[in-house]
Amino acid sequence: MKVGWVGDCVYVIGDYGGFNITTKTSVENQTAKGWYDECFVTYCDPAGGERIQEVPGGVKANNSVDAGIDYIIALIERGKFFVCKDCTGVLGEIWDYSRDENNQIVKVNDHYMDAMRYAIFSAVTSGVVMA
């Protein structure tokens, strides 16, 4: 997920994903696309363990699900959140993000949503994990 800020607006400008591919293959594909730049931190799924070390600039993301979702919803409500039309992974999942009858996040078809939340919320909290 590539995310950028202009002022207080957040722009999702690129997404990349694949199923059942290794971290090495993912990194190679993203490197070929020019995604790794020394000036960017790469926030990774904290459950990734040692695989995070395989990602250039990889650090554990803030995985505070509810706080991260609430932050992104607030951006959307204020008109401060934009997604590039080429981000088909994000656009394909964003409307599926939902809660069940107990107000718990439904964990299905959400890989891009998790990546987006990691990128946006980890950056604004400087990687601080909120409990």
Enumerate the language-model features and the residues they cover.
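Mg2+-dependent endonuclease catalytic cores in nucleic-acid-processing enzymes, primarily RNase H-like
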Residues: 7-107, 126-127, 131
